[in-house]
Amino acid sequence: MSPKGSLWYKNAIFYEVYVRAFYDSNGDGHGDLAGLIQKLDYLQNLGVDCIWLLPIYPSPLRDDGYDIADYYNVLPTYGDINDFKELVRQAHARGMRVITDLVMNHTSDQHPWFQAARSSRTSPYRDYYVWSDTDQKYKEARIIFLDTEKSNWAWDEIAGQYYWHRFYASQPDLNYDNPAVQEEMKKIIRFWMDMGIDGFRADAVPYLFEREGTDCENLPETHAYLKEVRAFLDQHYPDAILLGEANQWPEDVLPYFGNGDELHMNFHFPLMPRLYMALKKEEKTPLEWVFERTPAIPENCQWCTFLRNHDELTLEMVTPEEREFMWREYAPDPKMRLNLGIRRRLAPLVDNDQRRIRLLYSMLFSFPGTPIIYYGDEIGMGDNIELFDRNGVRTPMQWDASPSAGFSAAPPSRWYAPVISTPPFDPQRVNVADQIRRSDSLYHFLKHLIALRKAHPELASGETRWIDTGSPSVVAVWRAESDRWLFAIHNLADKVQEINLTLPVVTGELTDVIEGRLTFNSKDSRLKVQPYQTVWFSNNVK
């Protein structure tokens, strides 16, 4: 691992793991921490630097663990605290870090705090949540899950009051106006940091506080508390990071970086749909537009970028017309849609076209930001739109070609979810073992791309310039730091593009560092780019 005090997260490769889906070590049909430990060598060989764990806490699993019933323990089907400590130890021994989800905004309604709170108005936990005698407060706050929730308030018969929830009614919001809640969250942070983890992905951070007359998002009180948490981390765990989930426009996310004293990293949500939009339209305008709206951030901060994750491909930050376009092109079946988004994985979104998958990865790795890979997307796994809600993109990892995909020795009736069984995404066609054997596989392409990114630190923190190509279908980016530079070209079209380039420097003949075939003489501005081709030229070739 990089040394303490370094900005390690700026040049890291993050890998998102849903423990339940990864590998079942004890034959109960559920992935577990011991199973993940057995697969750490696989992640190390791929080139992963940091593992992000979805929630591992005890939970009724109405929202796949984001409804926490105990912040100080591990879901029994995943293992126990000792298993978690061993995971962290083994990951660190392989040079990989571990961060876990910190669900700050809400708990499960099964949490003992909420059960005590609803039982009596004099309970010390009553003020851990937001209660009201009316459901008319905070009317300007939007409803996030419009598919299932009609209000942000839910009536509790036992409490005799309404409680506030920004997500599902089974997830009551914590009351951060209560100093005891603020201190409790710091205790939780200390508990897990003392086990050696390297930070947290802070879930749903814009919604911590409520104020009448506002939309109850991005409030000054929220930023003040997050800065307090950051100062606490910096004092006690200076190498740890906070990665924020703020599904907002880049200019609204900017304050979450503070002056480099709030969150270390934030997801860049609006980029994800525009990568797919640009690809389908075969034009770079959506990408140019979103990067023009992306402000500069403090030097010690970083954006996190991604092609897909465990949720739907969110279309909250597109116009209604763009949303209809995305649904029409990428989710023609209503089962593929969820809330304001698309519940599909990377490979099915692009019809399993390996050229387009590789192009998307190349853009992700050459554009500004730290990339995150969602488990299974490194081999092009499929989805199951027949499963409920977001479960369709959370199916078992496919390790081999067996009917169980090598995920579990349990009978299929005990699996937490079925393995993808229909071509072209069934285990016989998509699995880790096969792709490791084949040098031309998506796995090996991505492994090569990861190695290239690490060999080119200018991609992590260097200057970014967008180069005119003379073609609306070809996006080109120049990344430079000190005397090192890398120039990446991406053809979004399904036809050959002849482009004209004027580079910031003239160096003579260059060779593509991805495949080593295409050459370009920078003294000659003309270049022919094949359909969906991606090329990287660099003066830093090892």
Task: Identify the role of each PLM range.
Residues M1-K542:
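Active-site and adjacent substrate-binding regions of carbohydrate-active enzymes
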